[in-house]
Amino acid sequence: MVSAAASAGRLGSALPFLLVLLDLQYQGAECGINAEVEKQLEMGKKLLAAGQLADALSHFHAAIEGDSDNYIAYYRRATVYLAMGKSKAAIRDLSKVVELKQDFTSRLQRGHLLLKQGKFDEAEDDFKNVLKSNPSNNEEKEAQTQLTKSDELQRLYSQALSAYRQEDYEAAIPLLDEILAVCVWDAELRELRAECYIKEGEPSKAISDLKAAAKLKSDNTEAFYKISRIYYQLGDHELSLSEVRECLKLDQDHKQCFSLYKQVKKLNKQIESAEEFIREGRYEDAISKYDSVMKTEPDVPVYATRAKERICHCLSKNQQATEAITVCTQVLQLEPTNVNALKDRAEAYLLEDLYEEAIKDYETAQANSENDQQIREGLERAQRMLKQSQKRDYYKILGVKRNARKQEIIKAYRKLASQWHPDNFQSEEEKKKAEKKFIDIAAAKEVLTDPEMRRKFDAGEDPLDAESQQGGGNPFHRNWNTWQGFNPFGSGGGPFTFKFHFS
């Protein structure tokens, strides 16, 4: 696609040649110009050649103020406008040149610009006038070439319009491509191609054309409205809000833009509020806000999917594993490679001790986001936890969840310690079994009530396992002699043998 900016750049690169052509065409024409106007023209010419367009423009403004009938000043100002991409202003100045001095050069240049704007009839009038007025061979050749080009462009336009009306958008697009390669400043053609792109499911290309149209046509509220609608349908509420505001800057009473603005602003506010709650760790509040998002916009599926993705995250972070797995799965049914949902469901699986499922989710996430350090660390942790679960799982020993509070852990420990105290058993075999069980129960309590030891265990490292400690003796080794006489209900005092009596 040829952008307006690119075309202006190419035209700008041809300006020194046009200036030389002008000076040759009007050699000696500046004789008789008053000194101040001549000075302004010369300064403007030098600045234009140096590419200092804004400064050059101010000098040509001054020259025209000093002599409003100076066609050279208008021509040079038109040249600056052209370099700045202001084709409408350039055409006005070229029309003034034609009015002041019937001239082939200015007519040809104006015809070129009119053709780039898609004004075929007006461009053809200029080219035909050149041909009628005894032009030089080069001028005649150029005018005839442009006239032929204009006829061909009109033929292509007729075909494109016919294809569009027949809803054959696939056929219309290449025809419009060919026309817009020449008519780079035709806003209506860009809007027509944008409509074709929308129908063909290519919203990003439609946005590109509509943005160009918004720049080419002043007060183009319709283009801004359409851009905002497309962004909204894509789920980009922030860009949608930005574009609809541009529409309202041009016309604050624009009904469609104002209606869309209210909707997007409300949705945007809810999403921003929900994200702020997430940053603060207020997950229940964030879930409530995202529920509101789905109620605010029930008709655009992407918002429900994004809301559920964030609810999945909140539930996982809030250690509501069962609910998190349900919501994350709903998201993944729609988007099987959604990396965020895969990570959050993996974490929820870990809370439920479903290590293999967590590993599978992390591996899928990694396949779709290879350089994500969080995924790599999560996968390694899940693999360690699977290996750990095949050895000794302190949570399972006490029969508590991974997110159990300290009070729950102590309560479970006391119950099991009283149940499995070896003094409760008579036979030697039963005592040995109880001793082993009791040691595991006491070890589980030791690890899970110590924040640092629990953190290590949750990361997949057993702080009481010599192998996990990477060499050396196990500083946490325990046997029955260590625990003999230990009171699971006491908080101090000397050791004693705990006896149970049942009536």
UniProtKB/Swiss-Prot annotation:
Signal peptide: 1-31
Repeat (TPR) residue spans along the chain: 37-70, 71-104, 105-137, 153-186, 187-220, 221-254, 267-300, 305-338, 339-372
Region (Flexible linker) location: 374-392
Task of the protein: May be involved in the unfolded protein response (UPR) during ER stress.
Pfam family name, one: TPR_19
UniProt-annotated location(s): Endoplasmic reticulum
Intrachain S-S bonds: 247-257, 312-328
Protein name: DnaJ homolog subfamily C member 3
Main location: endoplasmic reticulum
Gene Ontology MF: a single term: protein kinase binding
Superkingdom of origin organism: Eukaryota
SMART domains, per database record: DnaJ, TPR
GO cellular component, as recorded: cytosol; endoplasmic reticulum
GO biological process: cellular response to cold; negative regulation of endoplasmic reticulum stress-induced eIF2 alpha phosphorylation; positive regulation of translation initiation in response to endoplasmic reticulum stress; protein folding in endoplasmic reticulum; response to unfolded protein
J domain residues: 393-461
Gene field: DNAJC3
Keyword match RNA-binding: no
UniProt keyword list: Chaperone, Disulfide bond, Endoplasmic reticulum, Repeat, Signal, TPR repeat, Unfolded protein response
